[in-house]
């Protein structure tokens, strides 16, 4: 048997709750393991070989609680596994510095703890916890727009020789300066900005690539996303969306031989609809021309559980980061980032990235 992969997560929201509850779902339903998992094994690591040993958050109602309790705390809304049947764990949730991680629309829901600790004090506490728990990989599920908070955690990884999986659109693995830092320290980093398993952007970029490869010319396209969880509420703050829009747009543009002009493509989150909860709706349109310059168009409506979409990809990102550690690889893990993330340092087609 392989040793457990020791993981800490930053941002104990719906995405993490979906990851934990999903693993427990497969524990309780082993016959379902063929459904929803890209790779049952990656170099002998299964989805059951991940041990979440610590978590970090800013919410006063989560800090100090055990992992199995915190994933059900407000404003989390994933409820695939009843709380009373979720196995207990000794792993705790510890305080993380808020920095820019709490937007104006969500601060009344998240209610950040006011401990009065200075960032230097928290940083020391965090590094001590990481050492005590033997963390090998940190996964960042910070909210969109958490630029300074993401950099804080990236630096913590560099200081403690811990691999970093960056699920959010704050550019670390795809930033040349940060990529060089991880390369120089020989620490793996997988990022940035997780693709959904069958999400809005992966569907959009796949169809864009199909149209491109079939010899048609795309003239304009849009993708509009709406949802009802804290992620979409946070994204009502337009100033937090700069990196997100870049990430999603470049993910689609990278699949075209000739990128579209900026005024011919729109890809981005659009609004918060409370009653949708964790359901995300995507509306996509492509307009183009084919043989004999004849016009065509297509429209797609996609309805998905936003957090199942994330967890099905992160489960591979963690295992691939561990394999990189086992093999002594450092810096951006190119193929893993290209296949699993929207904004890798090097874009590839999805089939090429999967086989790289």
Language-model features: locations:
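N-terminal glycine-/serine-/threonine-rich beta1-alpha1-beta2 phosphate-ribose binding loop
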Residues: 1-153, 241-245, 282, 291
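Catalytic cores and adjacent flexible loops of soluble metabolic enzymes
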Residues: 9, 52, 137, 182, ...
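Active-site-lining helix/loop region of Rossmann-like oxidoreductase modules
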Residues: 10, 48, 62, 73-77, ...
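Structural motif
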Residues: 10, 141, 167-168, 192
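Hydrophobic beta-strand scaffold residues
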Residues: 164, 188-189, 218
């Amino acid at each position: 048997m392989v040793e457990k992969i020791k993981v800490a997560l930053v941002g104990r929201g719906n995405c993490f709750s979906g990851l934990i509850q999903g693993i427990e779902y497969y524990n309780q339903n082993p016959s379902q393991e063929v459904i929803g998992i890209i790779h049952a094994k990656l170099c002998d690591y299964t989805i059951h070989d991940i041990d979440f040993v610590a978590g970090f958050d800013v919410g006063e109602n989560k800090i100090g609680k055990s992992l199995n309790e915190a994933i059900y705390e407000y404003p989390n809304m994933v409820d695939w596994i009843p709380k009373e049947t979720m196995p207990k764990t000794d792993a705790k949730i510890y305080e993380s510095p808020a920095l820019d991680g709490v937007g104006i629309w969500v601060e009344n829901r998240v209610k950040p703890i006011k401990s009065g600790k200075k960032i230097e004090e928290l940083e020391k506490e965090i590094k001590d916890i990481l050492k005590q728990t033997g963390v090998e990989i940190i996964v960042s599920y910070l909210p969109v727009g958490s630029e300074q908070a993401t950099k804080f955690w990236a630096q913590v990884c560099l200081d403690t020789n811990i691999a970093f999986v960056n699920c959010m659109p704050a550019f670390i693995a795809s930033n040349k300066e940060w990529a060089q830092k991880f390369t120089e320290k020989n620490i793996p980093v997988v990022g940035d900005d997780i693709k959904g398993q069958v999400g809005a952007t992966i569907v959009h970029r796949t169809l864009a690539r199909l149209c491109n490869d079939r010899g048609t010319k795309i003239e304009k396209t849009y993708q509009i996303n709406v949802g009802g969880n804290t992620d979409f509420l946070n994204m009502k703050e337009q100033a937090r969306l700069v990196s997100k829009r870049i990430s999603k747009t470049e993910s689609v543009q990278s699949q075209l031989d000739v990128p579209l002009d900026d005024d011919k493509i729109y890809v981005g989150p659009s609004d918060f609809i409370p009653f949708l909860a964790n359901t995300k709706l995507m509306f996509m349109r492509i307009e183009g021309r084919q043989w004999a310059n004849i016009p065509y168009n297509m429209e797609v409506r996609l309805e998905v559980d936003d957090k199942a979409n994330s967890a099905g990809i992160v489960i591979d990102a963690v295992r691939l980061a561990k394999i990189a550690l086992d093999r002594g690889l450092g810096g951006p893990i190119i193929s893993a980032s290209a296949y699993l993330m929207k904004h890798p340092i090097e874009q590839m087609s999805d089939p090429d990235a999967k086989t790289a």
